[in-house]
Amino acid sequence: MGESIVKVEKLSHRYSVQWAVRDINFEITKNGIYGLLGSNGAGKSTIMNIMCGVLKQTEGKVYIQGVDLAENPVDAKRHIGFLPQKPPLNMDLTVEEYLNFTANLRWIPAAEVSRAVKAVMGRCDITHFRKRLIRNLSGGYQQRIGIAQAIIHNPKFVVLDEPTNGLDPNQIVEIRHLIQEI
């Protein structure tokens, strides 16, 4: 087995009186592509939101690169890239403005922001749209921007919650290729 990136132990989460997930255990190792499968309402997004520090677990532990997410969330989150079901895009910004803003949120030193933005735009094939408002781009390109914000800080672990949802067949193929590259 490879190097452990994420370790989840006895993870449980309850919404009011209803358990969404109960006693979940798994480990994610370096260089793997993993998926959470299950029916609607099975708790997949709940698990991802907990692993990314968006939601606090009711019970159990999550370790990111050996760091306990509950005890040291800032340090653990430095290793995580996250694209939620609904990408957190600011439609009133250009692609470049948005990624500059995101880079500052992701602990990238000011002197390196420009380089990081250019690099991630190249990786996600969105450089030619850098001066365009996000709201004027197709769903596929908006999804690429969402992925770009998730990987701009070169995280060890990337979580993509339904990254191809709502895209046409050609866009789905493009996004799958992009995911394989990252």
Task: Tell me the role of every PLM-derived stretch.
Residues N154:
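Conserved catalytic motifs of ABC-family nucleotide-binding domains
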Residues V173-I182:
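Helical segment within the ABC ATPase nucleotide-binding domain
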Residues V158-D161:
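Catalytic Walker B motif of ABC-type/P-loop ATPase nucleotide-binding domains
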